[in-house]
């Protein structure tokens, strides 16, 4: 399966039990900031934004004072799992990022999708990739 198929079929799909509800944008990005696959709607990000996210995975709490920035959008960092998941909120939407051995899985959402639904979609794929050694 191609990386694009993972994004299209496992991240940008309808959320279980909520036909028509799906993430706004999604991507799989290597730890080095290289895009493996992304939805057409995923924002263009700066290398320093990705560096900040990677730093927060290695030093949990790094982004808390400044927020998580992606594609020029600032998200307030909320509870996550140190070294594994970063979650952010902006207005009625937000972002979930799951770190795997080689990649970061991103999901961005807006209402009516809930934070919990975004977390479920992103973390399920991230956990699968971890199980595959990726």
UniProtKB/Swiss-Prot annotation:
Gene3D superfamilies for this protein: Dynein light chain 2a, cytoplasmic (3.30.450.30)
Coiled coil region boundaries: none
GO MF term list: actin monomer binding
Alphabetical keyword list: Actin-binding, Allergen, Cytoplasm, Cytoskeleton, Disulfide bond, Phosphoprotein
Pfam families: Profilin (PF00235)
Top-rank taxon: Eukaryota
PANTHER family: PROFILIN (PTHR11604), PROFILIN-5 (PTHR11604:SF25)
Family: Belongs to the profilin family.
Chain's role: Binds to actin and affects the structure of the cytoskeleton. At high concentrations, profilin prevents the polymerization of actin, whereas it enhances it at low concentrations.
Protein name (Swiss-Prot/TrEMBL): Profilin-1
């Amino acid at each position: 399966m191609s990386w694009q198929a993972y994004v299209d079929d496992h991240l940008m799909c309808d959320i279980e039990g909520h036909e028509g509800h799906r993430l706004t944008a999604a991507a799989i990005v290597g730890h080095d900031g290289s895009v493996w696959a992304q939805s057409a709607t995923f924002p263009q990000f700066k290398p320093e934004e990705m560096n900040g996210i990677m730093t927060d995975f290695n030093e949990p709490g790094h982004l808390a004072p400044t927020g998580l920035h992606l594609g020029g959008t600032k998200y307030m960092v909320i509870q996550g799992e140190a070294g594994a998941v970063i979650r952010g909120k902006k207005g009625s939407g937000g972002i979930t990022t799951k770190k795997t051995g080689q990649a970061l899985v991103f999901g961005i959402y807006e209402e009516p999708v809930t934070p919990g639904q975004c977390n479920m979609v992103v973390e399920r794929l991230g956990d699968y990739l971890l199980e595959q050694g990726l």
